[in-house]
């Protein structure tokens, strides 16, 4: 029996939204999800800033599901009264609450490859995995990749770190790894290291946790909601501007980062310490299984279409 088709608006291919789309598509058994790059449709997985500022006023009375994530502040838009609006985190929900209503938080799922990978007997090959791309043009620095690499180099740990990025002296270019190789790369690290200024959700950190890899992370924004590992508390927050983009920047002290990195290094050589953190990370990641996502999406769509009166 052929699958029914559900056109899904995802505005890009080499981006985190496409990864979410692929992971969601794995969990659909009765519908075939087909990506639309061009315009919004009944099911949308997209950036909150781009979508709300460009489309929310046009589609404010259209029935649809809008599942959004962003690290950037949203400046304007309209309440999408007929839509079901979900965010990837409480952090994003709070950011857009004055623009549109939000029906709830819907966490992105990991790729099902993780469930095979987490049971594989893998030797740890490096202390840290770092994953992050910066927008082309160099005007926005959000992931702090080069800052991270400079600090690791200063501490003599650059050669014990695998970096997937598009800036700095990375080891692997972003969006080039097959999904199995990507999860294996994460699994081979003791810790996932992320020092981002802000994150709407943070797919790589969640993906690392899904194979039992804890994190060294900034204890703020979305990470504060689910990350397991060694936190770095920010000491202040500012709003940073880059052209038409604005984002919150959670400031961290170099010395606090160094101390967290040292703590991770020490934990990695203490079996009880590491196994405890790894088990907690893996257990926490189960909240991202999302096995009922098809039933939930289809039920929501049927409900809003049933109640729609043009």
Predicted regions: what they are:
Residues 1-55, 290-291:
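N-terminal pre-catalytic "stem/leader" segment of glycosyltransferase-like enzymes
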Residues 75-77, 81-102:
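A short, active-site helix/loop in glycosyltransferases that binds the activated sugar's phosphate group
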Residues 91-92, 99, 105-116, 167-169, ...:
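Short beta-strand->alpha-helix junction loop in the catalytic core
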Residues 112-170:
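Conserved catalytic-core segment of nucleotide-activated headgroup transferases in glycan assembly
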Residues 184-200, 213:
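Acidic donor-binding loop of glycosyltransferase active sites
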Residues 214-217, 224:
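Short hydrophobic beta-strand element within catalytic cores of glycosyltransferases
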Residues 251-259, 268-302:
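A charged, aromatic-enriched C-terminal amphipathic alpha-helix characteristic of glycosyltransferases
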